[in-house]
A protein has these predicted regions:
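Residue-level recognition of conserved beta-strand positions in structured domain cores
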Residues: 40, 84-86, 118
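A short, structured loop/turn motif at beta-sheet edges
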Residues: 73-80, 95, 107-113
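Hydrophobic/aromatic beta-strand elements that line small-molecule binding cavities or substrate pockets
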Residues: 16, 54-55, 68-74, 86-88, ...
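Short, cysteine-centered beta-strand-loop-beta hairpins and adjacent loop/turn segments enriched
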Residues: 89-98
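A solvent-exposed, acidic/Ser-Thr-rich amphipathic alpha-helical stretch
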Residues: 4-7, 25-78, 98
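Short beta-strand edge/turn micro-motifs at domain boundaries
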Residues: 100-128
């Protein structure tokens, strides 16, 4: 998918990925809106994590790699919604974790920049890391 919306979301997602992998807290803080919430599913059940909690938790992880594929992108005035397939490999609390997830990211344009205000993360339904 090579339309303008996909290109914008792909650039934002790459920037976010690069900030995560390099533990660039300043850049991550700039990319996530003050009202950011991560909503997801773990083996223990559903969870919600607000911005400061997420920024704190992400610093305890060593992200080795994140592969991204933009499956869909939609634009609405000052909002973008992206569906992203991601394959993560990270170390957290001494364990290596590999996971394939589908992300729904909602970006808002405020103060002359795009910021993620919501991220929903769920295990990939196909068990793979690409659209079915």
């Amino acid at each position: 998918m090579a339309d303008k919306n996909s290109e914008i979301i792909e650039a934002l997602e790459r920037d976010w990925r690069d900030a995560l992998c390099s533990k660039d807290v300043e850049r991550m803080s700039a990319l996530v809106h003050p009202d950011f919430i991560l909503i997801g599913m773990r083996s223990t059940g559903p969870f919600m994590m607000h911005r400061n909690e997420w920024l704190d938790a992400i610093q305890k992880r060593d992200v080795e790699s994140i592969e991204l594929e933009i499956a869909d992108a939609k634009a609405f005035d000052k909002m973008l919604v992206g569906t992203v397939y991601a394959k993560w490999r990270l170390r957290y609390l001494g364990r290596v974790i590999e996971d394939c997830v589908v992300l729904t990211d909602v970006w808002v344009f405020e103060d002359d920049r795009w910021q993620a205000i919501r991220r929903h993360s769920t295990p990939s339904p196909s068990g793979g890391c690409t659209p079915a």
